[in-house]
Amino acid sequence: MKTKNFIVPHDFSSVANIALQHAIATAKIVNAEINVLHVVGKGKDISEAEKQLNDIISSTNSEVKLIPNVRIGNIFEDIGDFAAEKHAELIFMGTHGIQGWQHITGSNALKVINSSKVPFIIVQEKTADDDGYQNIIVPLDLNKETKQKLAVVADIATYFKSKVHVIT
């Protein structure tokens, strides 16, 4: 069976750590590895970001394979591009970060989501628990790409015995 691949964009905030914990909890169930991605702005030194990301990964107690990745670019393009390159099934992203992404709310979060054909699980400041997700909300239109994402939602809902709410 092919190992699934998840992406967790990480800005070194506490909510990014929570997104990582959600990804780990789900990855254990579906046999996935996790690429943890930090995007550094153009002209910035990546060595400190690499060190911070490696420190986070080494301090995370996980049975799941965590792979550090640092890219130079911007979050609006690079998260989606990276997910496509890695053939990711899901992106787990925290919102309301306090450092690099302090403005990832509202339309900025939507820009990141819209830049990718890979489905997102958006988390806030609630940690993952063993029960998974009681409710999953799926915004749905009738284009082909959106319909394809329903298979991933169905898998997650089956694993966690979640109730799915479709919004059109």
Residue ranges of each PLM-predicted region?
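Structural beta-alpha unit
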Residues: M1, V15, G41-K42, K51, ...
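Short glycine/serine/threonine/alanine-rich loop segments
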Residues: N31-E33, A88, V118, S162
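A charged, well-structured terminal subsegment
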Residues: A151-K163
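Acidic, proline/glycine-rich short linear motifs
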Residues: Q21-V64, V166-T168
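Gly/Ser-rich helix-loop-strand patches that form or flank binding pockets
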Residues: I79-D129
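A structural signal for isolated positions on well-ordered beta-strands in alpha/beta enzyme cores
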Residues: I7, E33-N35, I67-N69, I137, ...
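Intrinsically disordered or low-complexity boundary/linker segments at protein termini
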Residues: M1-S14, T95, N114-A154
